[in-house]
Regions:
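Short beta-strand-to-coil "C-cap" segments at the C-terminal boundary of structured domains/repeats
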Residues: 219-226
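Functional-site microenvironments in short loops/helix caps that host divalent-cation chemistry
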Residues: 5-204, 211-213, 228-233
Length: 233
């Protein structure tokens, strides 16, 4: 059982990231309110390192399956971080050659509106309508119905980072584990990144014990069964 002090200091979101990452960038109000104020309930979590994201996944699994047991339901597969390959597959939304999750190579729609929360130019944090993070689902989803696979906050993946993982991973279900590698894969780009980092094929990393105001995560789960049988007909 983890001690309360350890959980509070190591696994809860670090609210000081807003001041540490961007001094005077509205840091004090966000540091005070982002994690706890109901006005931010629909915003993505930030300030969590890789370990904290994994701990939350385990915590979520435990409580979900306890609720299932209390209601006479079967346990679910565990929540976890997606592998880098899973994340990219999800981001592409079924479009193998998609530059961005919305499918096309363009950053604006026909009306000239940006298609994600990111920084289109030097110092330009405002053109997308949001100065920093945005509430989830403010932009259109990809063809899998997934929101914010590009921009808003970058996302932790399960994999350790290597400059080229192809020679060292199994091609059927590639994931790269290395407990001695402190760098972990981060994907998707964020509100403070330029368009390059929003690309579905763009790779990046952060150190596993680092919490940032522009990195969050989403959970994945093994799906039992298949979506349809049409591909076998």
């Amino acid at each position: 059982v983890l001690g309360e002090d350890f959980v509070m200091t190591s696994l809860y979101p670090d609210t000081t990231v807003w001041v540490r990452d961007f001094t005077y960038h509205m840091g004090d109000p966000l540091m005070e309110y982002y994690f706890s104020h109901p006005a931010f309930d629909e915003y993505p979590v930030v300030g969590v390192n890789w370990f904290a994201a994994k701990y939350f996944s385990d915590w979520r699994t435990k409580h979900k399956n306890q609720a299932n047991a209390d209601n006479g339901m079967a346990p679910m597969p565990k929540f976890r971080l997606p592998s880098e390959a899973e994340w990219e597959y999800a981001a592409r939304g079924g479009r193998d050659m998609a530059t961005y999750p919305w499918g096309g190579p363009y950053l604006r729609n026909a009306k000239g509106c940006l298609l994600a929360n990111f920084k289109p130019g030097r110092g330009d944090y405002y053109s997308d309508g949001f100065t920093y993070t945005a509430p989830v689902a403010q932009f259109f989803p990809n063809d899998f119905g997934l929101y914010d696979m590009a921009g808003n906050v970058a996302e932790w993946c399960e994999d350790a980072y290597a400059d080229a993982t192809v020679p060292i991973t199994w091609d059927l279900n590639p994931v790269y584990y290395d407990d001695n590698e402190p760098r972990k894969v981060v994907r998707g780009g964020s509100w403070k990144d330029i368009a390059y980092f929003l690309g579905t094929g763009t790779r990046n990393f952060e150190y596993q014990d680092s919490a940032r105001s522009y990195i969050g995560f989403r959970n994945a789960m093994i799906y039992l069964g298949r979506s349809s049988g049409r591909e076998f007909r």
